[in-house]
Amino acid sequence: MAFRKENKIKSNFSKISIGLASPEEILENSSGEVLKPETINYRTYKPERDGLFCERIFGPIKDYECHCGKYKRIRYKGIVCDRCGVEVTEKKVRRERMGHIQLVVPVAHIWYFRSLPNKIGYLLGLPTKKLDSIIYYERYVVIQPGVKAEDGIAEFDLLSEEEYLDILDTLPKDNQYLEDTDPNKFIAKMGAEAIYDLLARLDLDALSYELRHRAGNDASQQRKNEALKRLQVVESFRASRGRNKPEWMIVRIVPVIPPELRPLVPLDGGRFATSDLNDLYRRVIIRNNRLKRLIEIKAPEVILRNEKRMLQESVDSLFDNSRKSSAVKTDANRPLKSLSDSLKGKQGRFRQNLLGKRVDYSARSVIVVGPELRMHECGIPKLMAAELYKPFIIRKLIERGIVKTVKSAKKIVDRKEPVIWDILEHVMKGHPVLLNRAPTLHRLGIQAFQPKMIEGKAIQLHPLACTAFNADFDGDQMAVHLPLSNEAVLEAQMLMLASHNILNPANGAPITVPSQDMVLGLYYITKLRKGAKGEGLTFYGPEEALIAYNEGKVDIHAPVKVIVKDLDENGNIVDVMRETSVGRVIVNEIVPPEVGYINTIISKKSLRDIISAVIKACGVARTADFLDGIKNLGYKMAFQGGLSFNLGDIIIPKEKETLVQRGYEEVEQVINNYNMGFITNNERYNQVIDIWTHVNSELSNILMKTISSDDQGFNSVYMMLDSGARGSKEQIRQLSGMRGLMAKPQKAGAEGGQIIENPILSNFKEGLSVLEYFISTHGARKGLADTALKTADAGYLTRRLVDVSHDVIINEEDCGTLRGLVCTDLKNNDEVIATLYERILGRVSVHDIIHPQTGELLVAGGEEITEDIAKKIQESPIESVEIRSVLTCESKKGVCAKCYGRNLATNHMVQKGEAVGVIAAQSIGEPGTQLTLRTFHAGGTAANIAANASIVAKNNARLEFEELRTVDIVDETGEAAKVVVGRLAEVRFIDVNTGIVLSTHNVPYGSTLYVADGEVVEKGKLIAKWDPFNAVIITEATGKIEFEGVIENVTYKIESDEATGLREIIIIESKDKTKVPSAHILTEDGDLIRTYNLPVGGHVVIENGQKVKAGEVIVKIPRAVGKAGDITGGLPRVTELFEARNPSNPAVVSEIDGEVTMGKVKRGNREIIVTSKTGEVKKYLVPLSKQILVQENDYVRAGTPLSDGATTPADILAIKGPTAVQEYIVNEVQDVYRLQGVKINDKHFEIIVRQMMRKVTIDEPGDTRFLEQQVVDKLEFMEENDRIWGKKVVVDAGDSENLKAGQIVTARKLRDENSMLKRRDLKPVEVRDAVAATSTQILQGITRAALQTSSFMSAASFQETTKVLNEAAINGKIDKLEGMKENVICGHLIPAGTGLREFDKIIVGSKEEYDRILANKKTVLDYNEVE
């Protein structure tokens, strides 16, 4: 009898390292060698000995029973049977014991020569093709040339069979009997053995030195890059000193995973269901055994070689079957699932089993509404509760002595005997449950409720909780989970209770806002009706008013006067007389007095503000009660008012006829113009669309007036709309106005929707014609189809966001940074999009802010800007405030509380441990799905806003122009005017008295200007106007036109219009890049004055030889046709920004300030040269197909686009620096969400952008351990530079024995060494200062950033699992388990919130438990103190 050791891993580890396994390690972890390919005996169903399921190796199949049955039962535990060699133990060891297969010949590991970057190839400097031919036994490789070196044969040479045999023939006789270490011996081998020898012979230090030299000195960029790539692999092996050896990439022993992880289950009928891995292992074993036998019988080399190659292939497919070109398939032609495949993807180990586990104590059912529940309650069906709380009931049954054993208690519960209901009531008190609705898009998708037992089988949900869950009662299901431990119960009660989650973490607005019926009821009773019964009465208090109402003396809507409690200016509660209505008095019975008297009509918007005010004034608990009161009142009043609508409430305005008629007339006019040839087809189309858009919006306005004045605004449809209960202006317009313009169906992948120019003139009340109906349905169905497709994209975006930001946690109070972001009002042209108040609220100021007029200190540096302070700042003349931001936070891990500011879900400063990264990701991802789901509500109606085409003075002001260049013309009315020909013209409106700049506008190129610089204008004066449909090119000189390179069907095509017979010249992209269409302007004598390039797509409106005056249009370029604003712009745009992708047509941007000169045309590109005042010259090539936005002699600033197109974030980063690009991304993404009406606080975007900017790339490595072009963490970079700061590098070691050239030493060590040498009169050490590394900030897309995180576990569970693990293993990476994902994977508490490591010592439980623990601790503590 022998005993075996047990080695268990402790679960409280703090880091995980990964590396290559050495053959010794594999042997150490193995419990025995698998020799036979057999699995189990098909008759007895017992495992075969030495096979893949052998009990001797992996442990017994039944608990405490050996194979032959000699030892049974637990008393023989640990004994190894002398007959069958099986250890008597539990059967679960079959889940953890490994075996191994000893291979006859080594094989290469497929991860390290098949996947890119090819590690073995880089180490040996061999290309993949050559490597393959060695590994798969096609070529010999010379490992040591020996005596053949003089014949020009070098190491790493490949030899074919013949060459190899020739060389063997010419070798001296005794050569093959020399020792392998003898430098004269010629050695060449093939297969993985050869690679093994080559890798084992590598001297990494020498190789590293040589490659560094090559990378530093090679002139050719390609060879330099090659050296750098190899260097990275070499350095990673050197860095993991001895933990990883290169030759371990060659496998000599294949580990066999435990049998329970690759089960084999007998089905009925003598068939077996098996894991694919068994097949793969069997092939390896069969081939290995066959090779053994062939070697024993001394088979010819050819046969052996073939068998070796097959062995290599079988091990390849075991490790990674998907990498191979010819994957091993089953009979059903399905590729087998190899070890790598079981890690990858959504169904792989990481995402399926480690990050997403199924849990016990959970239930799921349909939800129904529970209007009588309190805010923190939910209704749980009796049967469900009995099952969920089963163990608790059993415990109580035994405690109360109703039963003696657990078994009998179980029976009672299963039979649902009446005694258990009473116990269940008791157990459920103070033991909340968690409700969750999939998809859980943000943290409000899981909330805790106090359960109430109900009859029936459906879960009851509080109506106000629906918004957060995005639930409705049309058959949605929800899952219930039960928190078990004391800690979990406490967290559920304190942090997750629904009545505590009233605010939305994305923007701080209340999320439990009553909707639909509730809003309608409140709106109805707070609306006033002139001439109602009892109008004008006066009451001495709310009570009297209510009595009068109940007695029927006064109508609920009648305007009356009542003395009520309200707030005065200082916020004290006083009695005042207010003109109000009984309805409003009833509402104010519920409103807490601290908020004052609400004397307005209540809509959904105002309700949200009231709830915010209640939270600020009274705290969360009172707000929950208030919400319950509001809910009850709202439902009651909506029911009492009988607020439904009938067909008569949908009123069609009588002006509709005339409006439509007028539209037709205008369209007729446009078509006439087109037929006469005054306008192009494109212009006609744009104008028609414009006309109908105007008609539609005018009709909408009239409709709104009509419907709102109907029955004093008590029209049911109008009330639903106005209160915000249901419906939108769009929808009502379609019910009783006209459906309007619809989007045109387009082919998949086509850019932006065109609009059908014939509008649908009918509305739904009149009914649509067949054609109209057809167009209508198309839009509606497209909306539904889009939704389904986009939801997946939104989910994937959320996943990437979470992955990039999950390790951002508040880790300290204050990082002490002095930097911040400057915040101002966010404006677009002239209209304020986000006020300074919104942007600084809840942030922390960097400096003291002092009121410029009164000199009072508004807020000290490092203090939170509260509502009051923000209001004061907004009202003062202060334009900008520098605030702390996550983007400038200098915390080493996570971010600090001061830089983050206020936690939006609580309205207090954020606490340490808050998982702000995940909150940010959820806040951005959750509306992503909303964005996508928003398309179809208008039923595919085209939202097209007519472009404005003029600048009109909004105030009386003085004008100042900048960069203005004009030419004088006479416009079509005969007035003198100027045409702007500069691209950078700006006009500033300046207040005549104060000199403050009121607004700035860009004056577009080609606009007609009606004022002069410095002129003072009245409000409403037209400053400039331009053609909204076409971009133009205007001549600045008078003369004769001469075309060059304008050749029919090469650089232009003629489009003749069938309708008008007019012909237009349209420039097309020519295949022949030497032909550049351009127009020269010549003087009378034929001297060249100016040349204009004609851009692709331009319509030429003049003829060759024509005389032109300055200011005339030469070319019109139709602007993109009015596109239907659909979210299709939304989500892809957000993705594009977060992935830092370059847009499809990037603009060419100037990197310096300077003057523009046009260069030659090179290969279809126009050269633009920018010369700065300092004489620096930059050349840019712009494709001729693009319109060039600058002209000869223009002065441009750095960052100005030279051609049309979108600016790329990379350019902004390179030219304007990190801050500019951070603000650009935040603002651009915000724009997309704003367009959809989604409010998200800036700080969430800032967190994501911070994660995108974590890395720098090394320009000059200096004396640091970095390599050129290496991408490293900013922090790591700074630490490494600090490490070598002030140290010296040995240039010449002199006579020193301790130091050698190239070593980095401290000044002190150097001094000691040199003084010692000096005393002994030896040559001193020569040194130079250590050079620090330099770097450039880079911007990474979220996917790249998530894959480059410091934690390999997090990266591997995200994407490209095998590649990440492969890299990590070679680098011998260590995961410190700092983020959330890693800890979830390891089954630890997450390092955020209550899981912060500093809270480890907190114990939640009853007093008795605490005392017991203390008693146990005391003995330990005394012992520790002695130490």
Swiss-Prot record:
Mind listing the UniProt keywords for this protein, alphabetically? Answer: DNA-directed RNA polymerase, Magnesium, Metal-binding, Nucleotidyltransferase, Transcription, Transferase, Zinc
What is the main EC category here?
A: transferase
Query: What does this protein need as cofactor?
Result: Mg(2+); Zn(2+)
Which CDD domains would you find in this protein's record?
A: RNAP_beta'_C (cd02655), RNAP_beta'_N (cd01609)
**Annotated Gene3D superfamilies:** 1.10.132.30, 1.10.150.390, 1.10.1790.20, 1.10.40.90, 2.40.40.20, 2.40.50.100, RNA polymerase II, clamp domain (4.10.860.120), RNA polymerase Rpb1, domain 3 (1.10.274.100)
Q: What is its EC number?
A: 2.7.7.6
Q: Name one GO molecular function term.
A: DNA-directed RNA polymerase activity
Query: How does the record describe its quaternary structure?
Result: The RNAP catalytic core consists of 2 alpha, 1 beta, 1 beta' and 1 omega subunit. When a sigma factor is associated with the core the holoenzyme is formed, which can initiate transcription.
Q: What is this protein called?
A: DNA-directed RNA polymerase subunit beta'
Species whose genome carries this gene: Bacteroides fragilis (strain ATCC 25285 / DSM 2151 / CCUG 4856 / JCM 11019 / LMG 10263 / NCTC 9343 / Onslow / VPI 2553 / EN-2)
Q: Lineage of the native species? A: Bacteria, Pseudomonadati, Bacteroidota, Bacteroidia, Bacteroidales
